[in-house]
A protein has these predicted regions:
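S-adenosylmethionine
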Residues: 1-234
């Protein structure tokens, strides 16, 4: 990835219109990589819009089905796919009610409190409440259960949120592992993310923090706070 400090609109930067690159936080780019070699495999990207991870999956050679329930957000994904010259099957649907699969791999970037984006949105702590986070955690648990349904036996499921709250990350996945015998953790190996091995937890999950990667030029440092767990369907 490349970082730059430039004035003006993103669309006016060199290479954007030609589809040479897309905008994505460094932390947000990690979950898709943890699916491994997905060339020729069927992959469902759930809650996909605006599509940075969909583009990653398509570029890696997967047969991607991108699902999101918001048509306007899917329109952005469609535009991004066209701009970079990649292809994916697009479905506007509620993941909880969507019938499809099973897939070789599933990526679920669940709706969350987005507290991990605090370095870019410093107002986040004043806009989120404990009750709101609890409600989101319930939604995430339902979406994760559905993602498990959509993963074939032997397939891989990556769950992630851009949240710093354990209720939307570590605690939620621990509860799912206790509750559902169909899944087991597939620990992330430090060698899979060379250079940022310190983000791998003792349990084999991934936890990035906004304070990581400091730089003398503040606009060039840091990354979003993300939680990522990799699971395997039995």
């Amino acid at each position: 990835s490349v970082r730059t400090v430039a004035a003006g609109s993103i669309a006016s930067l060199p290479g954007y219109a030609e589809g040479a690159w897309w905008v994505q936080d460094a932390a947000a780019a990690l979950p898709a990589r943890l699916l491994g070699d997905i060339r020729g495999r069927s992959v469902a990207d759930l809650c996909a819009a605006p599509g940075g991870k969909t583009l990653q999956l398509a570029l890696a050679g997967a047969a991607v089905t991108a699902v999101d329930r918001v048509e306007t957000r899917m329109a952005r994904l469609r535009d991004n796919l066209q701009r970079v010259g990649l292809a994916a099957t697009m479905v506007v649907a509620d993941v909880e009610a969507w019938e499809a699969g099973p897939f070789d791999a599933v990526l679920l970037d669940a709706p969350c409190s987005a507290t991990g984006t605090i370095r870019r949105h410093p107002d986040i702590p004043w806009r989120k409440t404990a009750a709101g986070i609890a409600e989101l955690s319930l939604l995430q648990a339902r979406l994760l259960a559905r993602a498990i349904d959509l993963t074939r036996p032997g397939g891989v499921l990556v769950f992630c949120t851009c949240s710093l709250e354990p209720e939307e990350g570590e605690d939620l996945v621990a509860a799912a592992l206790d509750r559902d015998p169909r899944i087991r953790r597939k620990p992330i190996d430090r060698s899979e993310i060379a250079g940022i091995a310190e983000f791998v937890t003792a349990q084999g999950d991934l936890r990035t923090l906004p304070c990581a990667w400091p730089d003398p030029e503040p606009r060039m440092g840091g990354l979003d706070g993300f939680y990522v767990a990799r699971l395997e369907r039995r």
